[in-house]
């Protein structure tokens, strides 16, 4: 029987992976946090904090640091992957030789596969097979607030109901971290990926000084785009009204803790994409997801005008003013 005291291994020592590891550890699970950089892991072990990505949050005593992947995976049945989407396929290749029949895989990576636009579940099943219980963790949770223990809520979608309920019980905390179960893995994955694209648009709008009305319109029409794409792929429309859909979208579009929103703000103020990303200094998932989301929408025959215009700006040289003109000048239509 899996309990909150059962060990878990988190793969990925960035800000979000560290925050989740802290959350598990505080909730009673012996937690092993793996990172690919031995120097970084050694530094965290000494300082008992992730000074590089999540400074001033001290690790719980039962949070263990590990730079050896094989050893990290030996400790636990449940393996939680928290790496950028562009590194997701690579980490699957690395863990494959160390997987055992009892392992269960969860990921909190938000994005689509680079160059294909495929859902990460598809990538997992292609590379590792379909024999493992799978789950995705997604929702409106900034790493810093999560690590500080501030109230948060998130969605857990799994391909096995028993797995979902067991995993929910080990992370759900009555003191302020709520976990909602959902069986719609497609919808939960899409919500987490495409919201980053819309957040860039909201940032661009605010950077250009368009105000709260325009931002709210982008959020509202953005959830409509995400829902249309989700329906075309068999997702449940209700998913997009939940934590991993509207919840994550609103958070990412309205708070400057969001890298994607800050990236958009800089674009709206006239910086180019390369300079904006350098200023942020961490991965901007929405930059890469924009291209994949646009190409996925084209393949599915789904109209996604906000996504299309952001794609035109990031990859085809269109400027912010012309993007705004294109969106505002669209033909009248029903809601």
Swiss-Prot record:
Q: Mind listing the GO molecular function terms for this protein?
A: glycerol-3-phosphate dehydrogenase [NAD(P)+] activity; NAD binding
Q: Which residues form the active site?
A: 195 (proton acceptor)
What is its subcellular localisation? Cytoplasm
| Family membership | Belongs to the NAD-dependent glycerol-3-phosphate dehydrogenase family.
Q: Cite the PANTHER family for this sequence.
A: GLYCEROL-3-PHOSPHATE DEHYDROGENASE, GLYCEROL-3-PHOSPHATE DEHYDROGENASE [NAD(+)] 2, CHLOROPLASTIC
Listed HAMAP family: NAD_Glyc3P_dehydrog
The record's NCBIfam families line, in alphabetical order, gives:
PRK00094.1-1, PRK00094.1-2, PRK00094.1-4
Give the protein's function: Catalyzes the reduction of the glycolytic intermediate dihydroxyacetone phosphate (DHAP) to sn-glycerol 3-phosphate (G3P), the key precursor for phospholipid synthesis.
Annotated protein name in UniProt: Glycerol-3-phosphate dehydrogenase [NAD(P)+]
What is the organism of origin for this protein? Haemophilus influenzae (strain PittEE)
- Tell me the name of the encoding gene: gpsA
